[in-house]
Amino acid sequence: MNIHTPGLELTPDRDEAQAALDVLRQWAKQATPAEISELDPSVARLVPGMDGVEYPALSREYPSDFSLDDGYKETLPDLQNGPSSLIRGTKQQIQHVGISNFRLPIRFHTRSGGDITLETSVTGSVSLEADKKGINMSRIMRSFYKHAEETFSFEVIEAALDAYINDLESFDARIQMRFSFPMKVDSLRSGLSGYQYYDIALELVDQGGVRKKIMHLDYVYSSTCPCSLELSEHARATRGQLATPHSQRSVARISVEVENDGQCLWFEDLIEACRRAVPTETQVMVKREDEQAFAELNAANPIFVEDAARLFCEQLHSDTRIGDFRVIASHQESLHSHDAVSVLMEGETFKSESLDPKLFNTLFHVG
């Protein structure tokens, strides 16, 4: 049987490889087991039903003395950088491909001039073009680790983003860093103080050549229902009936675009803006005099969820370091078996036709 293989110097495509496999199997139907056994074992295994072909004996011990060299590394398969013929499904651009929640200690500046090291969860992703199979995700981690010893700011995050855009040859990219930021808070009357922890995320987005710096903050506060407060006072005034208004732990997720004007928006600045908007922040260290003061503070600042969104909005509007923003508030009702929620958006950055079905479920903060 004469088999002509013109063009072997060319790289065969998938159809040509399938045709070659069909030829091999046609030959195997008339070949003897001895002839097949003379084939390279990796080729012989492509022939169905040939029990005489034995799988090569493999070592089951870890080769601790194996030495890796550049030549061997060159032979390692790299499926993610393979040809577009390996793509499964539709050849479509993917907006975000990457890794989520890899953790490491990161050093951050504080407004007082010191540094603080915090356990940080990092998510990094890039866009993937329609004709590319995939990305080498470890490159995102490696690029980030090159900057891990620096004290982080948005400028350092930009350098890390540049590194993995170049490494992965992508157009769009994103880094998000989540951590819990401690800030000492004074009690209302007792003179005690303790650390309040704030969930913060920094996000740098590069899309279509436009970069945006975004800061997210979860602010936890007590909300006393204004309607319930008035009804309680009505019962006392008209019937001499003791009644208490309902209040509940509430959470606002504040997301702001940080303007590129050279002025730093410190974590502490955004936290204090939230306190000015809604002063009934949950307390850390509490004695009896603090508990009484907190009851008085709530009575002086009753608030519906609509009020909360607009009060936060007022503070964000007044800060020139802040561009677009979004406020998501959730009052986790003690009267109702459901929550009261509101979403307020300013500008194009956070606008969306749809909300994540689990969005409000992420606003629960347990003690």
From Swiss-Prot:
GO process annotations (BP): tetrahydrofolate biosynthetic process
Q: In which pathway does it act?
A: Cofactor biosynthesis; 7,8-dihydroneopterin triphosphate biosynthesis; 7,8-dihydroneopterin triphosphate from GTP: step 1/1
- Any one GO molecular-function label of the UniProt entry: GTP cyclohydrolase I activity
Q: Which organism is it from?
A: Roseobacter denitrificans (strain ATCC 33942 / OCh 114)
Q: What is the lineage of its organism?
A: Bacteria, Pseudomonadati, Pseudomonadota, Alphaproteobacteria, Rhodobacterales
Q: Which reaction does it catalyse?
A: GTP + H2O = 7,8-dihydroneopterin 3'-triphosphate + formate + H(+)
Query: What Pfam families does its record include?
Result: GCHY-1 (PF02649)
Site feature May be catalytically important, where: C225
EC number, UniProt record: 3.5.4.16
Gene3D superfamilies recorded? Urate Oxidase (3.10.270.10)
Q: What functional role does this protein have?
A: Converts GTP to 7,8-dihydroneopterin triphosphate.
Protein's name according to its UniProt entry = GTP cyclohydrolase FolE2
Family to which this protein belongs? Belongs to the GTP cyclohydrolase IV family.
- Which keywords label this protein? Hydrolase
